[in-house]
């Protein structure tokens, strides 16, 4: 990818191809904010995009993640409302070196939830790896968005990190190691 738009678009296309090939089984979107932020910061610095453009790219990505659909049986639809496919976007927490993984794109993701035309929806499931040591501004913003939208779930970054280290990312049921399932 040469630009932030391309990085986001290619990540989405890769995710869409993967989730479609597994016929809707739960598949994490991942912890991508830090990856995207590298492209956003470079494009912002060079003047290719504005902060408004960066926010719009994330808004559009969230909307695209919400419109993924599968052909389901009536029995399946009777069990699960809203045709969920359990796409989890994980964010925040800390790296093994103690650096926060909160980025400007972490704020952009949460800001998308304030769009009046977006409304509530199951996808993407936004999971914040919470730690009391996260930046104060981010914790306050998480609290505000949680109160306003009820659209965020939280997991203890410290507990997950103690077991999975930096190899973790979030699945709807349990953390999983990249590249294969690890022995628990």
Specify the residue positions occupied by each region the protein language model found.
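Conserved catalytic cores of very large enzyme subunits
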Residues: 1-184
